[in-house]
């Protein structure tokens, strides 16, 4: 008898114990690979936080020194209570905290991939979950968030984490609300999600427990208002200051413009795939899941509603507020590719196979664009590394340090470099000025001149804004008469004129 005779040969596929062992080995192997990739990226691409995160680190240092954060700065970013608390925890690490935060953010991205994998696997199985992670890896916009240690990334992780908790145990209750409360201390969109979830669990929850749930729902907005009141004396400071900055950059364009922007903003880094193929995958997912599709549909629908509420409130109409629906559409791309495997009805299965073939052809056509996306991401990372290392080098150059400490103002081309200088040197806000905010050209102090006017790579700057005039002044990023060269650290040069 042949050793391959199916009547006698063991079938490891049918052995549940063997299956579990293989699953565990595969899981550990993939996690190990993910950790390895994170460490390689951290070493190869030595990036730094963005403008908002650096100001958060400055505020954390102020808290650690026993002072309230000073939000009254030129073009202040919106303060977020939880991110400021994290910055306070990071303060003992000194000027190493920026790179530590980038490393934590990269691990946060890995955690996000894990959560989206488990979320998709619970709904649609392992094959589609693996496809979903593969699609997510093409989202270079998400990877840029991690490389810049932006606090948007942990927010998305928490939102999908809360959805996963609910998916694993319907009407989960306080664990979901606790995660949403933490997310609500990073971005107010979670307030609406928490409120709607409370209404969802209310019919089946005893009144005493429902009251405790209500306290969790109210926790994030109350703590945010209280933080603003303590720091500024204005409980609505975050809202009013954000609206003012939005108006300054021309981002508050109203509900009409917001609606017209939805298809573009949903697209992430590839509107054809995310909106087009993702839209087809959404139809397949709804057909497969039926009632089980309500949770992701509600999550995406509330994301759209929040975006419109933000627009109606005069706040920024920018892509970040549609990221949750956009990410859900990216998951649907995986359904478009593999959903046919879960459909038994012949006609529907043929349609799903047709969608899968069409989707695969579109992805093959778009493959070169993904290569360009990664090339662009690498260029951005290289630009960020050069800018920050050069600036930090200038700030520590022996010939420049005395002038930087005692010869003010320090003038930089734009506001983008100000929080980095304050973070590195500990100088007060009055010591550093952006040329775009000056009424007249400086006659003394230190000029920090860059090889380029913009401190940030193009994709890291605000998009879709319509400023009426350029903020650049005639003297911006130029050597002025009477200033002498102090030091050069490519791409930065310091010039000084001290009385």
Locations of the language-model features?
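Perimembrane helix-loop-helix junctions
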Residues: 2-12, 16, 168-173, 178, ...
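Membrane-interface helix-loop-helix junctions at transmembrane boundaries of multi-pass membrane enzymes
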Residues: 21-22, 122, 204-214, 281-301, ...
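Signature aromatic-anchored transmembrane alpha helix within multi-pass, membrane-resident enzymes
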Residues: 27-32, 178, 214-222, 277-280, ...
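Transmembrane-helix motifs of polytopic, lipid-linked glycan transferases
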Residues: 35-36, 100-124, 157, 161
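Membrane-lumen/periplasm interface segments of specific transmembrane helices
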Residues: 55, 194-195, 207-280, 305, ...
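Hydrophobic, aromatic-rich transmembrane alpha-helices
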Residues: 116, 198-202, 267-306
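Hydrophobic/aromatic-rich transmembrane helices and adjacent perimembrane loops
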Residues: 146, 152, 192, 276, ...
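Membrane-embedded, lumen/periplasm-facing catalytic core of multi-pass transferases
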Residues: 358-418, 424, 432-433, 437
């Amino acid at each position: 008898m042949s050793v391959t005779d199916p009547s006698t040969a063991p079938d490891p596929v049918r052995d549940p114990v063997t299956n579990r062992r293989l699953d565990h080995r595969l899981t550990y192997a993939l996690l190990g690979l993910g950790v390895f990739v994170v460490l390689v990226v951290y070493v190869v691409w030595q990036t730094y936080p963005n403008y908002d995160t650096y100001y958060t680190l400055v505020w954390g240092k102020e808290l650690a020194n026993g002072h309230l954060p000073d939000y009254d700065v030129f073009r202040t970013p919106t303060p977020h209570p939880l991110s400021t608390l994290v910055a306070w925890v990071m303060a003992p690490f000194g000027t190493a905290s920026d790179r530590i935060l980038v490393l934590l953010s990269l691990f946060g991205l890995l955690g996000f991939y894990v959560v989206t994998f488990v979320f998709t696997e619970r709904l649609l199985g392992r094959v589609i979950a693996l496809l979903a992670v593969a699609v997510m890896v093409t989202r270079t916009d998400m990877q840029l968030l991690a490389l810049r240690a932006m606090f948007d990334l942990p927010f998305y992780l928490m939102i999908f984490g809360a959805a996963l908790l609910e998916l694993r145990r319907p009407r989960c209750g306080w664990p979901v609300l606790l995660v949403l409360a933490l997310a609500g201390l990073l971005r107010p969109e979670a307030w609406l999600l928490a409120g709607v979830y409370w209404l969802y669990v209310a019919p089946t929850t005893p009144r005493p427990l429902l009251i405790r749930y209500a306290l969790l729902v109210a926790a994030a907005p109350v703590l945010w208002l209280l933080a603003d009141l303590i720091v500024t004396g204005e409980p609505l400071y975050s809202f009013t200051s954000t609206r003012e900055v939005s108006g300054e950059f021309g981002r508050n364009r109203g509900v009409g413009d917001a609606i017209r922007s939805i298809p573009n903003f949903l697209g992430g880094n590839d509107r054809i795939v995310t909106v087009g193929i993702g839209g087809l995958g959404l139809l397949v997912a709804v057909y497969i899941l039926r009632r089980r599709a309500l949770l992701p549909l509600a999550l995406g629908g509330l994301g759209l509603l929040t975006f419109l509420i933000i627009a109606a409130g005069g706040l920024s109409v920018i892509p970040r507020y549609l990221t949750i629906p956009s990410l859900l559409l990216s998951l649907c791309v995986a359904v478009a590719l593999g959903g046919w495997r879960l459909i038994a009805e012949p006609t529907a299965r043929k349609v799903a196979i047709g969608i899968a073939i069409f989707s695969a052809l579109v992805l093959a056509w778009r493959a070169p664009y993904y290569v360009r996306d990664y090339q662009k991401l690498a260029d951005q990372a290289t630009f960020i590394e050069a800018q920050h290392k050069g600036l930090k080098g200038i700030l520590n150059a022996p010939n420049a340090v005395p002038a930087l400490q005692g010869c003010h103002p320090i003038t930089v081309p734009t506001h983008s470099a100000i929080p980095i200088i304050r973070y590195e040197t500990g100088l007060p806000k009055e010591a550093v000025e952006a040329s775009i905010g000056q009424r007249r050209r400086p006659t003394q102090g230190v000029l920090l001149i860059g090889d380029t006017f913009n401190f940030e790579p193009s994709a890291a700057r605000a998009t879709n804004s319509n400023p009426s005039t350029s903020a650049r002044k005639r003297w911006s990023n130029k050597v002025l008469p009477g200033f002498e060269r102090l030091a050069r650290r490519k791409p930065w040069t310091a010039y000084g004129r001290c009385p």
